[in-house]
Amino acid sequence: MTDQSPAPTAQDENRLIAERRAKLARLRETGVAFPNDFVPDAHAADLHARYDGLDQEALTAAAVTVKVAGRMMLKRVMGKASFATLQDGSGRIQIYLERGTLGEEAYAAFKQWDIGDIIAIEGPVFKTNKGELSVHANSARLLSKSLRPLPDKFHGVADQELRYRQRYVDLIMTDATRRTFEARSKAVGGIRQAMLNAGFFEVETPMLHPIPGGAAAKPFVTHHNALDMQMFLRIAPELYLKRLIVGGFERVFEINRNFRNEGVSPRHNPEFTMMEFYAAYADYRWLMDFTEDLIRQAAIAATGSAVLSYQDRELDLSQPFDHLTICEAILKYAEGYTQAQLDDPAFVRAELRKLGANVEGPPLARAGLGALQLALFEETAEARLWRPTYIIDYPVEVSPLARASDTRDGITERFELFITGREIANGFSELNDPEDQAERFRAQVEAKDAGDEEAMYFDADYIRALEYGMPPTGGCGIGIDRLVMLLTDSPSIRDVILFPHLRRED
């Protein structure tokens, strides 16, 4: 029967902490309280993989003795013998301890240990009468005393904010959380290996920028004391990576952090991880094919399959991704519009006003038809793009770094990839005309002067780099956190960031 007693109160917790501090004080009196001379030679998962299939007779014949260490998660004292569950970085293994083997003093010491303590065990591997793989302790040591009691098994870490704020406790108590971050590591590793296999060169570019650029976003501002100058945490590495293309590195990528001084939501964290890559002699169509394959490889690396379940719906990444223009997406996913209406700036502006958008303020006050259509897409269709879908043909006015189409006025060779209604990637054929780029920067400065806080600055050094000549290039950025949300069936970006940003504790 499950014990559903009330969760421990703060008073109970304070009493338990005091008792544990008293135990630690006694340990200090008797010798080294936190020894650091034990090295395990086995992990729980490896032991299960090797020996779960053997019976006790085979284990006895093998006579395998191991040294394991980890956190004690369960403890059952039954007179002269006890069982404990040890949790290490790979999983859990049962420990069997008996007074006759350990001796009176060591067994008495074990009985004083608490759930959460870090312990070391050495002994042979065997199976209990019930067939559970275990380690029979010939010796047992306390390596690190836990002063704070863990949440009890039934109540666990129920408070979602507590899970984010005290991720260390969440990782101890919640197997699913550990699996999420293991999958994240595998996904990033799979992406990195795929990039290296494709001939890309991994680089690291500055995190502190004298001029923020590479994205439409509000930066964090800081001050460099030694140089006595204002600096910005980077909002994107794009302009530095393209400088490297100018310098002769034809394929570069970077997996690193970006910082944007904006809101927090299930899809946004001020500090987040992006993978940006740039390839000389590539265009946006090549980028779409490459990105599609890259995301499949990440899914397989993290989960073993390109067919996933996300929030109880199937998500099939194995099939070709859809391609739609902004207007095609509105007509398909937002009911009631016609192409003639979408081609009428006054109509689109009126629709946006009905939907609650501030069309009188920046940036929409100065927006042309393309930017208005994009805003309507974001309000009406974006959230409905469950299937992987490339939205293509973005207007020039919202794409200041993208190459303009040779055949369609006002349109760039740009795409954004949406999956489950979220933007996952943004890429384009890069603008490598320095005079065109300078003109677009000037337009961005005008927008900033008119009140658009996310408009870009004029980066004279980047223009100088382009003036040396940049080959035709394609570049793309993939949001690692949002991608991992998909791969791990996580509803919030905070679920896939180890230490997400939270309000300061009172």
From Swiss-Prot:
Reaction it catalyzes: tRNA(Lys) + L-lysine + ATP = L-lysyl-tRNA(Lys) + AMP + diphosphate
Domain of life: Bacteria
Residues holding Mg(2+) 1: E416, E423
Entries under PROSITE patterns matching the protein: AA_TRNA_LIGASE_II
GO molecular function: ATP binding; lysine-tRNA ligase activity; magnesium ion binding; tRNA binding
Keyword field contains Lipid metabolism: no
Tagged with keyword DNA-binding: no
Residues bound to Mg(2+) 2: E423
Enzyme Commission no: 6.1.1.6
Necessary cofactors: Mg(2+)
Gene3D superfamilies to which the protein is assigned, alphabetical: Bira Bifunctional Protein, Domain 2, Nucleic acid-binding proteins
Bound cofactor: record note: Binds 3 Mg(2+) ions per subunit.
Entry keywords, A to Z: Aminoacyl-tRNA synthetase, ATP-binding, Cytoplasm, Ligase, Magnesium, Metal-binding, Nucleotide-binding, Protein biosynthesis
Any GO CC annotation of this UniProt entry: cytosol
Localization: Cytoplasm
GO BP term (any one): lysyl-tRNA aminoacylation
Binding partners and assembly: Homodimer.
Family of this protein: Belongs to the class-II aminoacyl-tRNA synthetase family.
Family matches, as HAMAP family: Lys_tRNA_synth_class2
Protein name: Lysine--tRNA ligase
Organism: Bordetella parapertussis (strain 12822 / ATCC BAA-587 / NCTC 13253)
Gene behind the chain: lysS
